[in-house]
Amino acid sequence: MFSYDFMQNAFFVAICISLLCPCIGIFMVLRRSSMIGDTMSHASLAGITLGLLTNTNPILGAFIFTAICGALIEFLRKYFSHHLDLILTIILSLSIGTAITLISSGKLKANANVFFFGSILTVNATDMISIAVLTILSVLTLYFLYNSLLYIAYDEEAARVAGVKVDFINYIFAILMAAAV
């Protein structure tokens, strides 16, 4: 089975993703915002369609749009802290609506379904390198911010009083979530 290059590539990417996702996911669950993953994945759909529409790299488009949505979620969460579920629903609806509108326009340069429902078996060397770099950078960032992220996850106000740069770390974490999606 591992004598085929595509299986080796798929196995390597699966290992990288299986290292990255739990490291980020644990903080999402601790912050009681596990639905943010669903919102970010729908935001990536809109980013992919924007990338295809502008004839740029759809993966880059997905990252940029998802990072913007993550930053928007954090910005709105600061002002409407008790309404995270409402914020996530609004961003999710905005993202899915944007994706459907762009797909329905008929102006996409490629088939969006190829990117939506891809296969891990079709990963190439460029994808492997970018996923490995992303995993290493994200895990290192989480390692260095671990104590602050844990403090914020349990009591954001106490972390703020203790001198933790809560807003800055929340924005970094939003970008890490966007990159993982």
What is each of the regions a protein language model found here?
Residues 11-16, 59-64, 87-90, 128-133, ...:
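Hydrophobic alpha-helical transmembrane segments
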Residues 1-19:
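Membrane-interfacial amphipathic/re-entrant helices at transmembrane-helix boundaries
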